């Protein structure tokens, strides 16, 4: 597989074309950002950890019947993925109250949500990824009602699979965001799943083991990511 020119540079990943029109290469960088890219720092080993963490999770999801863009690891910081036509919407599943939900509703952090909640946000850094609903997605042409239904179904399936995986590792899956795209007419899970895009707390101590350590200045960010990977059995 030949790596060609950079197609897109995000806050923490770069996307490259290949000699296959249906495949891309994702490069996981050490860049770590918060507050919609207003704060960016370099954290050693982060690209490697997130690349291998993502590969592990995507393979677990594929085994459970969730279609993903992931094909294979290419190295410590790179993987080969399917080229998706991305839907510009973030799907957020919450099992415990945290983050923007706490700020928006004024509820206490850590409350268990039963049932888990499903939310939609428009991917738009300039607007701060605004909270939207299903009617907005269809009315503005960001996706169809059928695509939304499949995205919700797959998001809840991911939650079911990963809740057990993390629980067995002594971790609470507090919340997470997913992005989806279309590949040959099928809705497929895209982007990545890593501690950058989810909240994970130690089940006993409620210690934060995710990017909130960076956002809140708690320190030991990569050490926490590596601890989560170790508990799951991710080969680093």
UniProtKB/Swiss-Prot annotation:
Pfam families: SAICAR_synt (PF01259)
Protein name (database record): Phosphoribosylaminoimidazole-succinocarboxamide synthase
Similarity section: Belongs to the SAICAR synthetase family.
Enzyme Commission number: 6.3.2.6
Family matches, as InterPro entries: SAICAR_synt/ADE2_N, SAICAR_synt_PurC, SAICAR_synth, SAICAR_synthetase, SAICAR_synthetase_CS
Keyword Ligase: yes
GO annotation, cellular component aspect: cytosol
Keyword vocabulary terms for this entry: ATP-binding, Ligase, Nucleotide-binding, Purine biosynthesis
Reactions performed catalytically: 5-amino-1-(5-phospho-D-ribosyl)imidazole-4-carboxylate + L-aspartate + ATP = (2S)-2-[5-amino-1-(5-phospho-beta-D-ribosyl)imidazole-4-carboxamido]succinate + ADP + phosphate + 2 H(+)
Superkingdom classification of source: Bacteria
Disulfide-bond pairs as recorded: none
GO MF, one annotated term: phosphoribosylaminoimidazolesuccinocarboxamide synthase activity
Gene Ontology biological process terms in this record: 'de novo' IMP biosynthetic process; cobalamin biosynthetic process
Pathway: Purine metabolism; IMP biosynthesis via de novo pathway; 5-amino-1-(5-phospho-D-ribosyl)imidazole-4-carboxamide from 5-amino-1-(5-phospho-D-ribosyl)imidazole-4-carboxylate: step 1/2
């Amino acid at each position: 597989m030949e790596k060609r020119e950079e197609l897109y540079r995000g806050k923490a990943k770069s996307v490259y074309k290949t000699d296959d029109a249906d495949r891309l290469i994702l490069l996981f960088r050490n860049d770590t950002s918060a507050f919609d890219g207003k704060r960016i720092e370099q954290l050693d080993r982060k690209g490697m950890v997130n690349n291998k963490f993502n590969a592990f999770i995507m393979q677990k999801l594929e085994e459970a019947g969730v279609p993903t863009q992931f094909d294979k690891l290419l190295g410590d910081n790179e993987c080969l993925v399917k080229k998706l036509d991305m839907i510009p919407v973030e799907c957020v599943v919450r099992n415990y109250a945290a983050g923007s939900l706490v700020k928006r509703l004024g509820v206490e952090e850590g409350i268990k949500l039963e049932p888990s909640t499903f939310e939609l946000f428009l991917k738009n850094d300039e607007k701060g990824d605004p909270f939207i609903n299903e009617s907005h997605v269809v009315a503005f042409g960001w996706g169809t009602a059928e695509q939304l239904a499949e995205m919700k179904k797959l998001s809840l399936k991911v939650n079911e699979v990963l809740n057990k995986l993390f629980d067995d590792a002594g971790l609470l899956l507090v919340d997470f965001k997913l992005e989806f795209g279309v590949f040959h007419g099928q809705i497929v899970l895209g982007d990545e799943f890593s501690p950058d895009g989810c909240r994970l707390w130690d089940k006993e101590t409620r210690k934060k083991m995710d990017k909130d350590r960076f956002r809140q200045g708690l320190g030991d960010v990569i050490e926490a990511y590596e601890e989560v990977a170790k508990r799951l059995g991710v080969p680093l």
